[in-house]
Swiss-Prot record:
Effect caused by changing residue 116 to E: In strain: TN106
Name the UniProt record assigns to this protein: Protein TonB
Keywords: Cell inner membrane, Cell membrane, Membrane, Protein transport, Repeat, Signal-anchor, Transmembrane, Transmembrane helix, Transport, Virulence
Upper taxonomic lineage: Bacteria, Pseudomonadati, Pseudomonadota, Gammaproteobacteria, Pasteurellales
Protein species of origin: Haemophilus influenzae (strain ATCC 51907 / DSM 11121 / KW20 / Rd)
Annotated stretches, region: 4 X 2 AA tandem repeats of E-P: 70-77
Pfam families: TonB_C
Predominant cellular place of this UniProt entry's protein: membrane
Stretches assigned to the TonB C-terminal domain: 182-270
Domain of life (superkingdom): Bacteria
Length: 270
């Protein structure tokens, strides 16, 4: 109700203000003087604006009413009823039931530590060469017998040394032979990798074998290639020489390897 009354009151005030302003404007409009009309018109417009600003009232928002809740009545201390505590029941043990004996934990046995791995077998030590013992010379023997015994000792020493040398040569020759064979195969593979079949000879279905000799330097380089046996076709011979000249060193030349080598290069069509 209060809000509606306020809104009606504001509306009436605004209508009155607007009526006053309109009447004032009409009154000023009827005056004959143009200058006075212009001056009064300016004054009237300024007054009307001020009146409008003053008359427009902002309606205040209604304040919320504070609703006070009634405090709940606190219970009187005398009327509070305490809940009865449950009676404690005494547990009577049955004498016929024997208590179970507590199990005693046995101490854990320590696990035996793993023994260390056995060390590797000791390397066989090189056997020492057993020197032939000198036979004692009997002083009682005559001079002729002494000469015979001394010559026998010399022969024994010579035989042992010659046998040792022969064994060493056999062992050394075995290792040298394998190394030389491997080096020879490496040179052969290097030459074959650079072998190119001439196109013209291939079209004409020409085949043949070329024997070529060349020098092997200390660093393994190949040089001085020449044909020792022709294949019968000049293009095949030239292809064999080119393969050797283009080949690279496969390593230093091993001891005992010849400084010159001869190989046979085949050109065949399948």
């Amino acid at each position: 109700m209060q809000q509606t009354k306020r809104s009606l009151l504001g509306l009436l005030i605004s209508l009155i203000a607007h009526g006053i302003v309109i009447g004032f404007i009409l009154w000023n409009w009827n005056e004959p003087s143009d200058s006075a009309n212009s001056a009064q018109g300016d004054i009237s417009t300024s007054i009307s604006m001020e009146l409008l600003q003053g008359m427009v009232l902002e309606e205040p928002a209604p304040e919320p009413e504070d609703v006070q809740k009634e405090p709940e009545p606190e219970p009187e201390p005398g009327n509070v009823q305490k809940e009865p505590e449950p009676e404690k029941q005494e547990i009577v043990e049955d004498p016929t039931i024997k208590p179970e004996p507590k199990k005693i934990k046995e101490p854990e046995k320590e696990k035996p530590k793993p023994k260390g791995k056995p060390k590797g077998k000791p390397k066989n030590k090189p056997k020492k060469e057993v020197k032939p013992q000198k036979k004692p010379i009997n002083k009682e023997l005559p001079k002729g017998d002494e000469n015979i015994d001394s010559s026998a000792n010399v022969n024994d020493k010579a035989s042992t040394t010659s046998a040792a040398n022969s064994n060493a040569q056999v062992a050394g020759s075995g290792t040298d032979t394998s190394e030389i064979a491997a080096y020879r195969s490496a040179i052969r593979r290097e030459i074959e990798s650079h072998k190119r079949y001439p196109t013209r000879a291939k079209i004409m279905r020409k085949q043949g074998k070329v024997s070529v000799s060349f020098n092997v330097g200390a660093d393994g380089s190949l040089s001085g290639a020449k044909v020792t046996k022709s294949s019968g076709d000049e293009s095949l011979d030239k292809a064999a020489l080119d393969a050797i000249n283009v080949s690279r060193s496969v390593g230093t030349r091993p001891a005992g390897f010849p400084s010159s080598l001869s190989v046979q290069i085949s050109f065949t069509l399948q």
